C-alpha cells in the first residue's frame, strides 16, 4: 500500500493551489484523486502543483500541474509562486529551476516576500498556440460572441505562454461581461484544438490592465498568472501599453514585464493556508500541521 503524500493548501492572489510533495515516489496523482480533492470544499483547488524529482540535469524539480477537472496543464504562474514559497520555507533557498510540460523556468523569492517567475518567451505563430487553421496575424483574429452586427466580444489577441490564451479587449468594466456564460463556450471553440484560456481585458492606462479569466480546465478564477502574462504581451504587441504593466486580476495586482530578451517576468505574492496528507491514488486526505509549509469560490469571491 502506497504511503500518503504531504500537501499544502495555498493560494496565489486567490488562485487556489495544492502543492503536493511527490519527491522520492514512483507514483503520480491520479485524475480520480484530483477530482475528489477538487470536490471537497476544504481542498477545492484550481491547480495541483505536484513536486517530483528532477528529470533533466540542471533543474531542481519536475512540476506536474493538474487542473481541477483532472486534466494536465502546461503552465501555472500563480501555482509556481506557491511552490517557491513552500520550498523556500523548507530549504532556506530562494532561487529554483523547475521543469514543467511547458519547458524550464526559473523563480526567485525576494526579501519582501514577493516571488518572481520567469515565464519564458511568448509564442504568437498560429501553429505554436495552436489554432485549428492558419491565421496571418494573431494580434487580432476573427472570433466573436453575439450578433454579427453587434458582437458582445470580438477580435481577440491570441498568444501562448506555454498554454493557449485568447484575450478579448473591452472598453468598459470587465465585470460588465458574463464570462461565466461565454467562457466555457469559447474555451471549447473549434478554433482551439487544445482548448484555451479566455480573458476579458480593459486597458485603463498605459501601464495598467484590468483582467478576468476563464481558465481552461478550471473555470472562473481569481487569478491566472499565465493569462496576465498573455494579456501584458498582447497589449504591448498591439500598442495598447508599454512592456511593463500592472495587471489587476480579481485577487489583486501582478507586475508583468516583457523584457528586451523576450522573456516575461511575473511578480506577485503567495499565501500558505494549511497542510495535510493525502492518498495520490484515491484523494483521501487528512489535515495536519506537518509537511510543506509556506510563510474558493468564483472569481469575485473571497480569497
Curated annotation (Swiss-Prot):
Keywords, in A-Z order: Amino-acid biosynthesis, Cytoplasm, Isomerase, Lysine biosynthesis
Annotated region described as Disordered, given as residue ranges: 279-303
Pathway(s) the chain acts in: Amino-acid biosynthesis; L-lysine biosynthesis via DAP pathway; DL-2,6-diaminopimelate from LL-2,6-diaminopimelate: step 1/1
GO terms assigned for molecular function: diaminopimelate epimerase activity
Transmembrane segment boundaries: none
Coiled coil feature spans: none
PROSITE patterns: DAP_EPIMERASE
Pfam families associated with the record: DAP_epimerase
Catalysed reaction, written as an equation: (2S,6S)-2,6-diaminopimelate = meso-2,6-diaminopimelate
Classification via InterPro entries: DAP_epimerase_AS (IPR018510), DAP_epimerase_DapF (IPR001653)
Xref: HAMAP family: DAP_epimerase
Family that this chain belongs to: Belongs to the diaminopimelate epimerase family.
Oligomeric and partner information: Homodimer.
Listed name of the protein: Diaminopimelate epimerase
Species whose genome carries this gene: Brucella canis (strain ATCC 23365 / NCTC 10854 / RM-666)
Gene (name only): dapF
Amino acid at each position: 500500500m502506497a504511503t500518503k503524500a504531504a500537501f499544502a493548501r495555498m493560494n496565489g492572489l486567490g488562485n487556489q493551489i495544492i502543492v503536493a510533495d511527490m519527491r522520492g515516489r514512483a507514483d503520480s496523482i491520479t485524475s480520480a484523486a484530483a477530482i475528489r480533492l477538487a470536490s471537497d470544499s476544504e481542498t477545492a483547488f484550481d491547480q495541483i502543483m505536484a513536486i517530483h524529482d528532477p528529470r533533466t540535469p540542471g533543474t531542481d524539480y519536475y512540476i506536474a500541474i493538474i487542473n481541477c477537472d483532472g486534466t494536465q496543464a502546461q503552465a501555472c504562474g500563480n501555482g509556481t509562486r506557491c511552490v517557491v514559497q513552500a520550498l523556500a520555507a523548507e530549504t532556506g533557498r530562494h532561487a529554483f529551476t523547475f521543469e514543467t510540460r511547458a519547458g524550464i523556468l526559473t523563480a526567485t523569492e525576494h526579501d519582501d516576500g514577493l516571488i518572481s517567475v520567469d515565464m519564458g518567451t511568448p509564442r504568437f505563430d498560429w501553429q505554436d498556440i495552436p489554432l485549428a487553421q492558419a491565421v496571418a496575424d494573431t494580434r487580432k483574429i476573427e472570433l466573436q460572441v453575439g450578433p454579427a452586427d453587434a458582437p458582445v466580444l470580438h477580435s481577440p489577441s491570441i498568444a501562448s505562454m506555454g498554454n493557449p490564451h485568447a484575450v478579448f479587449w473591452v472598453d468598459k468594466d470587465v465585470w460588465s461581461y458574463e464570462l461565466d456564460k461565454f467562457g466555457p463556450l469559447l474555451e471549447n471553440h473549434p478554433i482551439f484544438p487544445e482548448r484555451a484560456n479566455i480573458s476579458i481585458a480593459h486597458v485603463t492606462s498605459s501601464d495598467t490592465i484590468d483582467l478576468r479569466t476563464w481558465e481552461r480546465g478550471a473555470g472562473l478564477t481569481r487569478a491566472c498568472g499565465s493569462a496576465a502574462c498573455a494579456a501584458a504581451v498582447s497589449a504591448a504587441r498591439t500598442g495598447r501599453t508599454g512592456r511593463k504593466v500592472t495587471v489587476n486580476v480579481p485577487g489583486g495586482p501582478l507586475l508583468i514585464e516583457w523584457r528586451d530578451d523576450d522573456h516575461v517576468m511575473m511578480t506577485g505574492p503567495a499565501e500558505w493556508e494549511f497542510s495535510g496528507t493525502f492518498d495520490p491514488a484515491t484523494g483521501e486526505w487528512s489535515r495536519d500541521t506537518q509537511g510543506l509549509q509556506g510563510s474558493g469560490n468564483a472569481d469575485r469571491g473571497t480569497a
